[in-house]
């Protein structure tokens, strides 16, 4: 067999016997063991490429990959070369602390993901040399004959050669929520993947029936493999925070190195000692660099990650925490994300009228009501009773309990009918005793119905369900609520069907009749005209309970929500209307687009159409990927949610991919940045809120650290330029940076979220971290800080203090001003006093720790010796606190003035 045959042939377009010949196999005996071994060597194992995880060393080294860290490493090395070992130790200590924190948090995220992974190896039933074997799916090769039965996971792409009532749930691959009834009939070559009824795809689940198929593709050549390739090809988009921090760090690095070079140059021009000037230039660089920034970013994101984990959202990559906060569009998969992925009967129509079934999910608790919400006793309505019995007994599904959760084994549609009967009091196990099945006509795509014969005491009864029009052909009468039979009103039944389908419901008809003859005589020839129509059962995969409120919250936050699904447009529209994506009135033109309509759009029309529409139905994985790319090209920050294999490429392409942890596939989880452990779309609302809070706190830290670091650097530059003694020594600057960044700045990461955080629009993705307001605030505070430090330093010297005492005063002034300024940075929109002193207890703890540290460096002899400090008296402290208070008043006034001007007269 040619190695290219399997990959290039449209097997769905050929008759089954031609596919068998093409692959040199046998429809009953399969391949020989020898031929299978040769093909395994030629084609390789039936596996997808394994994603290589970063090694321990690579993950450690990644923590040092930051421009600011590079500068600190160089500065530390040069400082050590100059034999300033204390300074070098402090610099390297800051770098190591940052690396440790980052590594620990990344490891925690990876461990959380590992806990979600289900390491399951599938097996397949294969016929070789006429004998059935069970073997690992990895050993399958093109041409193998595979047997399928209900509950099996399809192990490779199969061209079916025979089947009986075979149905396959392809929702993980195509997004369609209802199982696909398979057959072996050849199809046109251009038939879309979702409509290829004669192919069973790798990774999908057999829900009913049995069959056999020839393997036509394995591993990377399967449709699942094609999606895997799309995942690998999808561009990993930098998060808004990552991109901004990268630019910001490069800008700071260049600016700080420029200032250091300027300092060194000025010192040389003034003929100062080259080594001392060089040391001062390094001190300026170290002082001006916000070395706490990488650590602050890591810790702030880690805190956000921990908060999200408590709300059942596991973050795989730390920057994803902030990305949700800047999201402008959420693309949500319908099945299993906005909906329960549990087909549920919503309404039962009988010739007597419509009856609503309350409740969702598989738990057997329900109330049957009429349209006026009045309870309907089952035994008081014969048609309702027999419709429920038909749905429960003419059924191959099973309702099982897994711990506290109820699950369906088999076809979801049959499961829905089984569940509603159980909810109405008809226990499936008891029915197997009171109405035992003695014969059956299984469902097939040609027959379009299923009928079963049951023993009812000494008589027999026929129960059936199927497509409405097919069941109408089988029914000659209809049953009333009193059990009386009357002529079938076909037109009324069709109108009721149209009414139910217009609500996005899938409708099946039920019927019953008296069984004649023996079970051996029961076949499809005895059914036509012998049944009485008992009702219509209308079902859907209902929206999650909190989906509508979550969508509304996203809209209030200025975030557009779009549904992307492989399901039919009618079903998608109905769900979208229920959750608030579409108005209850007729959807506006262009608000719902199908995959075919998307394919017909020109390149110029495509971006605007995608931006305008709210629902995308019958879309392929490639189209999902292109949709995300088009939205990103329009300037959107895109979050994509999903749980299926078909979602994986778009999950990876999106700025943040959100996978479902409970019902999601492993492919989707691996492609995602965040995994929701409760599979609840509403959790995304909480994640967006946390993400916005994270960015707020990062902004507060930057607002605090930039002026203080710049002030430290400018003090040295000014001293070199003027040619006087340094007000603060390099070692003292390192002390300030090391202690205040940890004890003061990092405490801002624990600030609670601001009021109204979910009522403001998303942040402009193009807005830089270094805004005009921040530049002005930085210049204001750093100027005040430098001026006050110089004033106090000069005052102390002029009033008889020694150089050590004057520098100690300036050192403590820097720290106290930074502590006071910290409170001003707790909110960028409100007064610090309105927040409450104890709203963030970490601030109080940090300030207290910093106070103890300042006492130690000022009054402990050992610290005095290392840092060249000296004790200062109470009068100096009074001056320090007076200056800090004055600066705080100036900053508060600067914060309030814009709001005062903005108020109407």
Swiss-Prot record:
Protein's membrane topology: Multi-pass membrane protein
Domain of life: Bacteria
Pfam families attached to this UniProt entry: Cation_ATPase, Cation_ATPase_C, Cation_ATPase_N, E1-E2_ATPase, Hydrolase_3
Cell location: Cell membrane
GO CC annotations, alphabetized: plasma membrane
Active site feature: 333 (4-aspartylphosphate intermediate)
UniProt catalytic activity: ATP + H2O = ADP + phosphate + H(+)
Residues the entry annotates as binding Mg(2+): 643, 647
SMART domains, per the entry: Cation_ATPase_N (SM00831)
Family: Belongs to the cation transport ATPase (P-type) (TC 3.A.3) family. Type IIA subfamily.
InterPro entries named in the record: ATPase_P-typ_cation-transptr_C, ATPase_P-typ_cation-transptr_N, ATPase_P-typ_cyto_dom_N, ATPase_P-typ_P_site, ATPase_P-typ_TM_dom_sf, ATPase_P-typ_transduc_dom_A_sf, Cation_transp_ATPase_P-type, HAD-like_sf
PROSITE patterns noted in UniProt: ATPASE_E1_E2
Stimuli inducing this protein: A member of the dormancy regulon. Induced in response to reduced oxygen tension (hypoxia) and low levels of nitric oxide (NO).
Major place of residence: membrane
Its EC number(s): 7.2.2.-
BP term (GO), one: intracellular potassium ion homeostasis
PANTHER family per the UniProt record, alphabetical: CATION TRANSPORTING ATPASE (PTHR43294:SF21), SODIUM/POTASSIUM-TRANSPORTING ATPASE SUBUNIT ALPHA (PTHR43294)
GO MF annotation list: ATP binding; ATP hydrolysis activity; metal ion binding; P-type sodium:potassium-exchanging transporter activity
Transmembrane intervals: 64-82, 88-104, 248-268, 281-301, 716-736, 738-758, 778-798, 808-828, 842-862, 872-892
Protein name: Probable cation-transporting ATPase F
Keywords of this entry: ATP-binding, Cell membrane, Magnesium, Membrane, Metal-binding, Nucleotide-binding, Phosphoprotein, Translocase, Transmembrane, Transmembrane helix
Organism: Mycobacterium tuberculosis (strain CDC 1551 / Oshkosh)
